[in-house]
Amino acid sequence: MDFQVFIITGLSGAGKSQSLRILEDLGFFCVDNIPPKLVPTLIDLCLATNGKISGLAVVIDIRTENFLEDFKEMVDTINSKNIPFKILFLEADDEVIVKRYNETRRIHPLLREGKTILESIKLEKERLQEIKTFATDIIDTSQFSLKDLKDNILKILSSFNSSVKSNFLITITSFGFKYGLPIDAHLVFDVRFLPNPFYDPKLRPFSGQAEEVKNFVLSKKEARDFIEYVKNLLDFLVPLYQEEGRNILNIAIGCTGGRHRAVVIADEIFSYLSQKYNTHLFHRDVDKDRNIAK
């Protein structure tokens, strides 16, 4: 995707830090409480990485000196660079912000000016009123859960890139049960019911990445049927995991030694899922039995 800039501002206690964490999980390079004057320089540094950093998200708040003037100048500079950007303004009801500060025991940035918490909130609203007019998106988080906040940010990002949910990561790991289950697995599929190439002396020295072994495993109807069942199951499950707010799904596929059957099946599932999702493939134990024929 093209380089994108996401600027978060708004009321203290409205969810700016949580929004930044969400964007970090989505692959953005994130900086909190940065002066507006530094943002154009930071953009140039990110662009100089030749695509290694594809998105920048920053939080800018009222603690910055000359906030309004510098913010306007920053927006003009970004516009001149012809870079797509969003300005998200977060707000919430006064009572909700007071409750959040009481729960976290943090200090509102304007309390240092000798104000009460409510006076600080009202003063901040006044100072940010003009900044709010620059916002491309305004979100009231008063009734939001963390999932609600993430869903709204994803909707905003979809105007950058319709495939923003590709930041959801799936890992597929083949493994051998005799070496233990992957401890981070969310879904585990056991393929030890399939005929084992290990018992064919001609196939034993090869791994499931070899055409001979792959053809042997996939020639079995039960293997082909199993792959289709798993595909259908994942078509059902993966969108639900995404809706639930998960950022990563770890799938483990195991056979006895993790060298033959699991490798073949993992390759097939990877080929299918990688057409739709950001998917990584690992063959954890494929080389552990490589000298077994000796």
From Swiss-Prot:
Gene3D superfamilies: P-loop containing nucleotide triphosphate hydrolases. InterPro entries: P-loop_NTPase, RapZ-like, RapZ-like_N, RapZ_C. ATP binds at G10, L11, S12, G13, A14, G15, K16, S17. GTP binds at D61, I62, R63, T64. The keyword Cytoplasm does not apply. Keywords: ATP-binding, GTP-binding, Nucleotide-binding. One of its GO terms (molecular function) is GTP binding. It holds the Pfam family RapZ-like_N. Displays ATPase and GTPase activities. Belongs to the RapZ-like family. This is Nucleotide-binding protein DICTH_1001. It comes from Dictyoglomus thermophilum (strain ATCC 35947 / DSM 3960 / H-6-12).
